């Protein structure tokens, strides 16, 4: 029993859901169809003269457009608008704010319009006078986040019918609209009602008579014996037939002319959009090329830095000791070349001048003996090393030993000041002849 009740409830729920979705789809289809008929009527009758609020066709079109923009609009919210009702104007005000040179701010500042419904109706008229209605709707539809926030899932603005609507509204740019925004029609208190009767009239074929003609022919058939066998066939002359054909062709021509203007306006809009997209594409292409060139420059700079760092690392790696050995040889050569003057002084001048003596304040010769031993060790190491052998112990980095050697060399006084060292405190000669090497500096 309970299972059957649950199944019945589910079936009723599914059927009600299907009925609801069908009703919403029918509402969308009816509104889009009647909007198409209304636009065609405006294009047919007012391509050569402006339209104002006195036109019944415009009043009906404004009502249709208001119903479309209000279709499946989310419920009233008292905190959002000043009159306690949230209408489509609140959606237009947010979604169309990105349109360049829009009329939203001017409508907001109108003193005689206070309610959201009145502002929405004023916006419809201003957008038609600006001939930018399709642009406003297209921009609003691009803001999908705001559209989902204001409309339910089955609304026209949330379905593909909205794209059809924007295409239909492009043709209105061929019409000149002229409205006065100060009137009772913009009070926003009375709801609008769509008049469907202009679009539901049955177009009777010319092969049959009207109701009055049928009555007249029926009455005449009862009184006259020479009545036609087929009372429903029209009794028209050739002139009436040609006039009716001409009138029908004229109507077709006007419709085709209106469609031609609509298609031309649509082509112009698409061309302008294509030009904008091409300009945007060129701008993005230039940005892409500039970014690629900058990336190449940065890549080359980074490659140069990497090569420089690799060269520095190669110089610091202890595997190749040739530069270090060459520097050690140069250092040994310089140290050896500095001592012959001291040897000449010790041998020649010491033999010729035996009266040289040391003063009491003579400096210790330990630094000189250390430097001499360093020179002899360097010569012995340089001569005893073969070309194939590495400098220093095998498998051991010689850099720390060289660092210590550099420190010891820096502490030894230079032989450049040897003459002053000899003349001031170290050596004194009693020979009357002065030697250039022993003269005071």
Swiss-Prot record:
Keywords: Coiled coil, Phosphoprotein. InterPro entries: Run_dom, Run_dom_sf, RUN_RUNDC3A, RUNDC3A_B. Interacts with the GTP-bound form of RAP2A. Residues 1-293 are annotated as: Interaction with RAP2A. Residues 380-389 have a biased composition (Basic and acidic residues). CDD domains: RUN_RUNDC3A. It comes from the Eukaryota. This is RUN domain-containing protein 3A. One of its GO terms (biological process) is positive regulation of cGMP-mediated signaling. Residues 211-234, 367-399 are annotated as: Disordered. The keyword tRNA-binding does not apply. Residues 367-379 have a biased composition (Polar residues). Belongs to the RUNDC3 family. PROSITE patterns: RUN. The keyword Coiled coil applies. Gene3D superfamilies: 1.20.58.900. The modification Phosphothreonine is found at residue 210. Residues 262-317 form a coiled coil. Residues 52-184 form the RUN domain. May act as an effector of RAP2A in neuronal cells.
